[in-house]
């Protein structure tokens, strides 16, 4: 877990196809109440369904993008015990998810 070469921000991108909105709502509520994004310096850039699927984006797939000050901060959020053990399990069975951390620039 090292910062990117520029020491700049990193982005957590999660894509999802949701099948159970109630489970996702419980996950979203718990994540929001936990304050984990803020505790790790994360800020939501965008979330939801695309405004315009211009090429190759599948129907029914949404995304959330969260900006962190560094890759280390993003990884600290993602791998935190609170997220992995208390929050993330709440979305189990809600849909299919993909997640990746990207360095800016």
Could you tell me what each predicted segment is?
Residues 88-105:
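C-terminal end-helix/capping segment
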């Amino acid at each position: 877990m090292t910062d990117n070469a520029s020491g700049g921000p990193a982005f957590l991108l999660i894509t999802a196809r949701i099948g159970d909105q109630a489970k996702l709502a419980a996950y979203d509520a718990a994540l929001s109440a936990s304050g984990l994004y803020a505790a790790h310096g994360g800020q939501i850039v965008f979330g939801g369904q695309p405004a315009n699927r211009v090429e190759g984006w599948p129907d029914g797939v949404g995304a959330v993008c969260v900006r962190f000050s560094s890759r280390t901060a993003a990884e600290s959020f993602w791998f935190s015990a609170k997220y992995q053990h208390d929050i993330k399990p709440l979305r189990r069975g809600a849909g299919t998810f993909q997640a990746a951390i990207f360095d800016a620039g």
